[in-house]
Amino acid sequence: MKLKALLPVLLLTACANMPVPVSVSSDEDAAETPVEAPKKSDALLDKVQELVAKTQEAAISSLPAEITANKSTYKTVEAVADREKNQKGAGFTRVYGDDDEVVITVFLYNNLEFGMTAEVSPATEALMDKHLQEFSAMQDSGLYDSVVVGEKNVRDLRWAGRKFQVLETPVSFNQREEAKKSYLVLGANPDLLSYVRIRFTYPQGRRDIERNKNIVTARILNALAVFAKDQKAQ
């Protein structure tokens, strides 16, 4: 049974096995004393989390080994990095790059976001703000300096007949006296119950990245959509 079909079953079972207060009484004491049933829900929810993690890992692994955009090719530098080892529910990453210090990190969250939408929402905005705060933290730690966060922008993309909406924000900073730029792109895939973050990091002045980022983003989101569709079909 695939994740999409199995999740509701496990969740309903988990709810059915939530601890229920039970009252007992005696002749000496008419007061009710609550007694909790054994907890089974934690194990079931852990099972759901495990299934989601396996699906997210398979999804990030399904991304193409290379991504082309115009005349540029970005090859896989790190196929799958398991962030679950560091923090439960953290998710998985795949890293692309070229020979000129361009790094593209795809991050697929493992966060069980039920009821999420493919469109940009207040939740998307809040998640973007959280990641932008990380740049301030990097500056406070001395790893970055001269951090400048640009305006957030909602962008509509289309690829292979599919529509995608993302929230994007440019960030410029200096790292070891080198001027760099990051472009954060945040989208969502409701079928995978997950947000997708793509971070482009490159030396300032690389106009080719400005031209290619939308194509790369659309290709990645489309590949994840194809994976999700195949999972539903099986």
Predicted regions and their residues:
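Sec-dependent signal peptide recognition
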Residues: 2-9
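Signature of long, low-cysteine stretches enriched in small and polar/charged residues
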Residues: 137-185
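Surface-exposed amphipathic alpha-helical segments
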Residues: 193-234
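Extended hydrophobic
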Residues: 178-201
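A short acidic-to-branched-hydrophobic micro-motif
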Residues: 91-130
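Glycine-rich, often proline-containing surface loops adjacent to acidic residues and nearby aromatics
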Residues: 101-105, 163-165, 191-199
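C-terminal motif of bacterial Sec signal peptides marking the signal peptidase cleavage site
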Residues: 13-14
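N-terminal "mature-domain start" segment
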Residues: 19-103
